[in-house]
Amino acid sequence: DTHKSEIAHRFNDLGRHPEYAVSVLLRHLVDEPQNLIKKHGEYGFQNALIVRXXXKAPQVSTPTLVEISRKQTALVELLKLVASTQAALA
């Protein structure tokens, strides 16, 4: 939250609404995974996460990597649902 408020404060100094600025800055964090799921499907997305995580943290067990990738995929789906709900309410 401190980082978010710091970013918002910087953009507010530029005369922009802070919440808008943060949403614009963080939009790619939602869009990129959603686009990858659309392109490769959930299975392919989870495999990509497992490969990425194994390269960064080889000491983590395969079952743990699989569980983390499943949770990340579920989170992306939840964010997609939230975004579509917000768009419907707007």
Swiss-Prot record:
Binding positions (Ca(2+) 2):
13
Ranges annotated as spanning the membrane:
none
- Which UniProt keywords are present, listed alphabetically? Calcium, Copper, Lipid-binding, Metal-binding, Methylation, Phosphoprotein, Repeat, Secreted, Zinc
**Cellular component aspect of the GO annotation:** extracellular space
Q: Where in the cell is it found?
A: Secreted
UniProt modified residues of type Phosphoserine: 5, 61
Q: What is its main location?
A: secreted
Q: Has keyword Zinc?
A: yes
The record, for InterPro entries, names: Serum_albumin-like
Q: What induces it?
A: Up-regulated by fat diet.
Q: Where is Ca(2+) 1 bound in this sequence?
A: 6
Q: For the modification Phosphothreonine, which residues carry it?
A: 62, 64
Purpose: Binds water, Ca(2+), Na(+), K(+), fatty acids, hormones, bilirubin and drugs. Its main function is the regulation of the colloidal osmotic pressure of blood. Major zinc transporter in plasma, typically binds about 80% of all plasma zinc. Major calcium and magnesium transporter in plasma, binds approximately 45% of circulating calcium and magnesium in plasma. Potentially has more than two calcium-binding sites and might additionally bind calcium in a non-specific manner. The shared binding site between zinc and calcium suggests a crosstalk between zinc and calcium transport in the blood.
| Name of the protein this chain belongs to | Albumin
Q: What would be the name of the gene that encodes this protein?
A: ALB
